[in-house]
Amino acid sequence: MKNHIMNMKTYSLFLDDIREPRECLTYLHDPRYGTREWVVARTHDEFVSTILSRWAEGEFPELVSFDHDLADEHYDPAMYHGVDAYNNKAIEFKEKTGLDSAKFFVQFCIDVSIELPECLVHSMNPAGRERIRQTLFDYERYQQRFGSNKS
């Protein structure tokens, strides 16, 4: 049977490495960023840990807001394409983005058979913002077509 959020304690979850929720008011004009009490996760790992630990306590977010760029070193022009131009060597980025967090969250909802709650994307990275939105939209479309129950 599908889990329902109405039977759980809820919270609002904000994923961003730098900003506070209230700062999003200046460009999104959504009053929820200024009026809600948010749980803030600064990294993908912190996001995952928050979801899992609060789920174990019978809590699930009723609202999630995603940033995309969680590690600014990925966007340093000297380090594009996985090459550290400062030291002339290949590098591997270890920090995950908000897209990884959105994918985790969608998979978590599938695994526990719960509907995806309302999700916002406050990222200022247009390509990253669109990829997160598309991931969430694809899952919502899947839910509408097939339901969220596991087979």
Segments the model singles out, each with a brief description of its role:
Residues 1-151:
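Catalytic phosphate/metal-binding cores of nucleic-acid and nucleotide-processing enzymes, i.e., regions
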